[in-house]
Amino acid sequence: MQSLVIFILLVIFSTSTYAQQRPQESFNLNSWNVIVATGTFVSPQFEGSKHYRVLPLPFIRASKGNYFIQTEGPGLTANILNHSRLKLGPSLQFRSERDKDVKNSVLKKFKTINSSIEAGGFLSYSIPVGAPGTNITTKIKAMFDLGDAHNGYTINSSITFNKVLNRRTRIGITLSTNFGDQNYNNTYYGLSAYNKIISGYSLYEAGSGFNDIGSSVNVTYSLKNNWGLIGIFGYKKLIGPAKNSPIIKNIGTRNQFLSSIGVSYRF
């Protein structure tokens, strides 16, 4: 898997270099399109949790032609390629801590896992299929811990079917999976000697591997005067090292849901 990570980084670097060598359009803020949205996001308190939390959902996207910069969950990503199908660029992401604020009484006693800032990049490619506005997009995104929260990396792979249903409604259906290296998986799914004493659960050292497989549906509906509605519903099943974790087996669940609803405005 380390070879795959190196390959991804080489592709990102080489493609970025190629993009910089191509003639670029002049930069003009007035020609950028901006979308802002706000709403609520419901997700598990931590990976594998039975309990959920409700968070605000701010979103902003600025685009010009094929270029864009946008928020993506608790992070930021940008496309640096002037290409209609191929997208590539850097990403930053915040991962929240797992501390004593969780609802489970056993997990409250575990050592806190600090929050982290992660950096990496993504690469995606879209293939038009059928009617205009319909495409299939494959995407891979690698993120690395910049601090000492887990000192590891994750790789998200996904494939999305996008379709314009009518002049107001768009839908996206995504299948995805997440891979974590040993450092990442052992931090969030492993059980140390200290936590074994606290909980009475078995010691567990999680190895690298795929941790989940999931799907989501994203629907956008355009209203009048540049307003719109956004709805997202997702589900994933924990597998591999995550499934075998004593934390998931004893106080968590393999079934993870998320949902979001928001209102958007296009400038």
Annotate the PLM regions.
Residues 38-42, 58-64, 76-80, 121-125, ...:
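Residues on the lipid-exposed face of transmembrane beta-strands in outer-membrane beta-barrel proteins
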